[in-house]
């Protein structure tokens, strides 16, 4: 679980990177569909799934909106992300293993966009936080 120090580190990092959330989401989702092409199956209803397309940008923005929500609900991710968990489990039917894949892409993008802020301590705390988000999103699958 997240310590108070982890929570503080995530909040501090988010305060610096939050205004770039749309760009982070676009880049992370674009990387995911290139590096893990099997994830394209969830977006087969889109006319264009190429990196940086309008649909990728819009969904990247939506994903990062979910991350922003998670930051605001950091003290109780399970309850705070309950609606998103239900949506991903029952409506979208996303394999929860993909949350880990996208988390990795988000970490890569943040590390390249914000190298000075992405300290080893920030990396560990953000990784733990994103793992907690993935676990909370997978809650309704049980």
From Swiss-Prot:
Keywords: Acetylation, Heme, Iron, Metal-binding, Oxygen transport, Transport. SUPFAM superfamilies: Globin-like (SSF46458). Heme b binds at residue 88. GO terms for cellular component: blood microparticle; haptoglobin-hemoglobin complex; hemoglobin complex. Transmembrane segments: none annotated. The modification N-acetylserine is found at residue 1. Coiled coil: none annotated. GO terms for molecular function: haptoglobin binding; heme binding; iron ion binding; organic acid binding; oxygen binding; oxygen carrier activity; peroxidase activity. Red blood cells. This fish has two hemoglobins: Hb1 and Hb2. Hb1 is a heterotetramer of two alpha-2 chains and two beta chains, while Hb2 is a heterotetramer of two alpha-2 chains and two beta chains. Belongs to the globin family. Involved in oxygen transport from gills to the various peripheral tissues. This is Hemoglobin subunit alpha-1. It comes from Notothenia angustata (Rockcod). The lineage of its organism: Eukaryota, Metazoa, Chordata, Craniata, Vertebrata.
């Amino acid at each position: 679980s997240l310590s108070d120090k982890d929570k503080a580190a995530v909040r501090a990092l988010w305060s610096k990177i939050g205004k770039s959330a749309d760009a982070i989401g676009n880049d992370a989702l674009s990387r995911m569909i290139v590096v893990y092409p099997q994830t394209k199956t969830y977006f087969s209803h889109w006319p264009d799934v190429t990196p940086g397309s309008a649909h990728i940008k819009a969904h990247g923005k939506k994903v990062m909106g979910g991350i922003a929500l998670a930051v605001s609900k950091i003290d109780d991710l399970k309850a705070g992300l309950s609606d998103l968990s239900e949506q991903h489990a029952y409506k979208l039917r996303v394999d929860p293993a993909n949350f880990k894949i996208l988390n990795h892409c988000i970490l890569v993008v943040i590390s390249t966009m914000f190298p000075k802020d992405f300290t080893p301590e920030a990396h560990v705390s953000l990784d733990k936080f994103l793992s907690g988000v993935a676990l909370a999103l997978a809650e309704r699958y049980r």
